[in-house]
A protein has these predicted regions:
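Short helix-loop "hinge" at the ATP-lid/N-box region of the Bergerat-fold HATPase_c
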Residues: 165-167
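Short beta-strand/loop element within the Bergerat-fold HATPase_c
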Residues: 173-184
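Short flexible loop/turn segments at helix-to-beta-strand junctions
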Residues: 10, 75, 105-118, 149
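A residue-level detector for a conserved hydrophobic packing site
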Residues: 155-159
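Conserved catalytic submotifs in the C-terminal HATPase_c
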Residues: 112, 132, 137-149
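Membrane-proximal HAMP signal-relay module
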Residues: 1-47, 51, 56-72, 81, ...
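Bergerat-fold ATP-binding/catalytic subdomain of histidine kinases
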Residues: 103, 200-211
Length: 250
């Protein structure tokens, strides 16, 4: 049983009254959990949506203050920049929460055939300079053609968040290898510290080690996209490398 997984009720044709009552109690508890889960999703979606405007207003006003820097001391400008960095983090966090809410509420009905070889190539090229800034080497291995029918924006989010995760949590000066084959997409990054908790790695806000610039939601977005389209996620720590793999139906 998985909350939000649209689980079908288990058949129970027992004639034993105690078992029947136990089954009825379990069904009631499951239904109550589903209602609470739906309310939580709705609250997060509504809250994230309502926060967009005030966050944008705060951001614009801070930019106006910085733009008129002549009226501020160097110390004041420094404090404003700190607030701006915190606000930028909140904006990214809010966008991620809103995206998660939309995915879970099925707000991406449009689908098309997504060419992951081309998508990974474009994304890797776009991020190559960012990787270079940390001295990281990004390599792409194509072992086959990979295509799947899904919303193109969500396909892009899937790839982007896997590559961002490798960048944020990978070793400076380390390597990131992206492998595309006929039925899987994997991203491996070198990283010390040992294996992460495979049972919780895709949960919201789980972080093996807090890293600046990370919202803790990237892998949750990956997992949400995969669950939406029936894909399987897998994590493994192999030869001092963290490997995240998405398995596609053959």
């Amino acid at each position: 049983y998985r909350v939000g997984g649209k689980n079908a009720p288990l058949a129970n044709d027992t004639k034993i009254a105690e078992f029947r009552r136990l089954n009825e109690a379990a069904i009631r508890n499951a239904e109550r959990a589903e209602v609470l889960f739906d309310r939580q999703k709705q609250f997060i979606g509504n809250a994230s949506h309502e926060m967009q405007t005030p966050l944008a207003v705060c951001r614009n006003r801070l930019e106006m203050l910085v733009g008129d820097g002549s009226a501020l001391s160097e110390e004041q400008l420094g404090e404003i920049m700190k607030v701006q960095r915190t606000l930028d983090y909140l904006v990214r966090l809010n966008r991620s929460l809103l995206l998660l809410s939309k995915i879970e509420n099925g707000q991406f009905p449009e689908t098309e055939q997504v060419d992951f070889n081309a998508l990974v190539g474009r994304t890797a090229e776009d991020m190559s300079e960012i990787y270079a800034g940390r001295g990281m080497r990004l390599s792409l291995r194509e072992e086959g053609r990979l295509a799947a029918r899904m919303n193109s924006s969500l396909g892009a989010s899937l790839v982007t968040n896997l590559l961002k995760n490798a960048y944020v949590h990978g070793d400076a000066g380390g390597e990131v290898t992206v492998t595309v084959s006929g039925d899987r997409l994997s991203v491996c990054n070198s990283g010390a510290g040992g294996a992460l908790d495979a049972d919780h790695i895709f949960e919201r806000f789980y972080q093996g080690a807090k890293k600046e610039g990370s919202t803790g939601l990237g892998l949750s977005i990956v997992d949400a996209v995969c669950r939406l389209y029936g894909l399987r996620t897998e994590y493994a720590y192999i030869n001092r490398c963290h490997c995240f793999t998405v398995h596609f139906p053959k």
